[in-house]
């Protein structure tokens, strides 16, 4: 316990006076007083430390869940992160049992997911310390939630479409920046790029597998979509550790439902995985900076579906594990694709692409499209606003790069 607390305290400012607590007038003085008490207790080790941290968490949680997420002031997200910081420190000082360490990691993850970066992203530093503590206590086999190799994996019984050659997305091997810009980016034409990610550590140094993902990220808490597609009425979201997600939705346990770790910035949360990938060179043709590129993870079993939709940026979809069937439609044919009228889903089609209701949506069958089965090691360029439908054919891990 002393060793863990020593590592945690070493990540903190040396003195209380150096510990920053700078908030605007939006944060009530009474709340700032609780923060200051937590800071004092952090350095003296006395008082109702953990209870005060929970007060901050409860107060800021209400602020985070008032109105729409985009309108939440950054001050409240920072406040939530401070609450997580103080709670983690209290947990690690009082107790260092395996359950407590896991609770501390979950608290850090909630701060990383819901809060804002504070003090040079100190919560990420805490996670590294806590993960090292777990790895010291357990061998990889003990840490792999019973060991995936000993379990029966969910069998993916999904249909594999036959891609018609006339409708196939064109393919090109390692085009130059100039030729990609001239032939595909400028005219906004989809294309599959081959041979541009073969050098990724995710393929070479430590190929991504269930076991590897559990080793580097098994104890991390992530958002999971539950349901076959986000337009379904029974669709929902929940928070699970990666180990729990794999146990519940990758390994046979509840074959009646699908879980999908979808459109999540996992690589900001787990830097070890970010080290396994590289931003495609072609992103330099955009107008934004590298920091403006949004990198998302898409991990789930066969049968997961992203309904026909469009994105507001250029997209490189890199396939690392498994295969995906993808169909693309030009934005010029938007009217034939019957977008939802609701503002929340205006970028999503009402049509079930592979089993369309031709009575309700008669024009859909007249819309031309391209299609492909994206294989591991391939990258699909999806031009901005191009409609695309995606279905996993088996256990799959994809990485998307949104850029302008």
From Swiss-Prot:
The UniProt record lists the keyword Lyase: no
Note on how the cofactor is bound: Binds 1 Fe(2+) ion per subunit.
Keyword check for Magnesium: no
UniProt entry keywords in alphabetical sequence: Biological rhythms, Cell cycle, Chromatin regulator, Dioxygenase, Iron, Metal-binding, Nucleus, Oxidoreductase, Transcription, Transcription regulation
GO MF term list: chromatin binding; histone H3K36 demethylase activity; histone H3K36me/H3K36me2 demethylase activity; metal ion binding
Catalysed reaction, written as an equation: N(6),N(6)-dimethyl-L-lysyl(36)-[histone H3] + 2 2-oxoglutarate + 2 O2 = L-lysyl(36)-[histone H3] + 2 formaldehyde + 2 succinate + 2 CO2
Ligand binding (Fe cation): 309, 311, 388
Transmembrane segments: none
Protein name in the entry: Lysine-specific demethylase 8
Organism: Salmo salar (Atlantic salmon)
Localization: Nucleus
GO aspect biological process, one term: G2/M transition of mitotic cell cycle
E.C. designation(s): 1.14.11.27
Main function: Histone demethylase required for G2/M phase cell cycle progression. Specifically demethylates dimethylated 'Lys-36' (H3K36me2) of histone H3, an epigenetic repressive mark, thereby acting as a transcription activator. May play a role in the regulation of the circadian clock.
UniProt-listed InterPro entries: ARM_KDM8_N, Cupin_8, JmjC_dom
Major subcellular site: nucleus
Domain JmjC as annotated: residue spans: 268-404
Cofactor: Fe(2+)
Enzyme class: oxidoreductase
Gene Ontology CC entries for this record: nucleus
């Amino acid at each position: 316990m002393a060793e863990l607390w020593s590592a945690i305290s070493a990540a903190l400012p040396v003195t209380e006076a150096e510990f920053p607590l700078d908030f605007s007038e939006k944060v009530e003085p009474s709340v700032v007083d609780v923060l200051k008490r937590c800071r004092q207790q952090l350095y003296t080790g006395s008082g109702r430390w953990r209870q005060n941290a929970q007060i901050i968490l409860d107060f800021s949680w209400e602020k985070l869940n008032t109105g729409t997420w985009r309108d939440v002031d950054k001050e409240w997200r920072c406040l939530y992160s401070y609450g997580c910081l103080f709670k983690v420190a209290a947990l690690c000082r009082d107790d260092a049992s395996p359950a407590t360490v896991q609770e501390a990691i979950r608290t850090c993850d909630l701060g990383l997911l819901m809060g804002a970066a504070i003090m040079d992203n100190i919560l990420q530093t805490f996670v590294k310390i806590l993960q090292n503590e777990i790895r010291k206590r357990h061998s990889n086999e003990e840490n792999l939630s019973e060991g995936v190799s000993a379990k029966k994996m969910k069998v993916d019984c999904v249909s594999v479409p036959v891609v018609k050659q006339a409708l196939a997305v064109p393919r090109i091997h390692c085009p130059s920046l100039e030729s990609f810009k001239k032939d595909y980016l400028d005219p906004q034409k989809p294309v599959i790029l081959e041979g541009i990610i073969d050098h990724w550590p995710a393929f070479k140094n430590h190929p991504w597998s269930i076991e590897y993902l559990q080793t580097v990220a098994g104890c991390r808490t992530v958002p999971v979509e539950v349901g076959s597609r986000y337009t379904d009425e029974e669709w929902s979201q929940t928070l699970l550790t990666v180990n729990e997600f794999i146990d519940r939705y990758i390994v046979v346990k509840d074959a009646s439902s699908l879980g999908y770790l979808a459109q999540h910035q996992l690589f900001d949360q787990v830097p070890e995985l970010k080290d396994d990938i590289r931003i495609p060179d072609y992103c330099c043709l955009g107008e934004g900076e590298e920091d403006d590129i949004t990198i998302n993870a898409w991990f789930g079993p066969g049968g997961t579906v992203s309904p026909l939709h469009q994105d507001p940026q250029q997209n490189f979809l890199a396939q690392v594990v498994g295969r995906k069937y993808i169909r693309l439609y030009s934005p010029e044919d938007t009217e034939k694709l019957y977008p939802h009228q609701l503002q929340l889903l205006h970028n999503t089609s009402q049509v079930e692409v592979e089993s369309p209701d031709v009575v309700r949506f008669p024009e859909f069958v007249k819309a031309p499209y391209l299609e492909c089965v994206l294989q591991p090691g391939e990258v699909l360029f999806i031009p901005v606003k191009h409609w695309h439908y995606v279905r996993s054919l088996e256990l799959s891990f994809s990485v998307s790069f949104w850029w302008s």
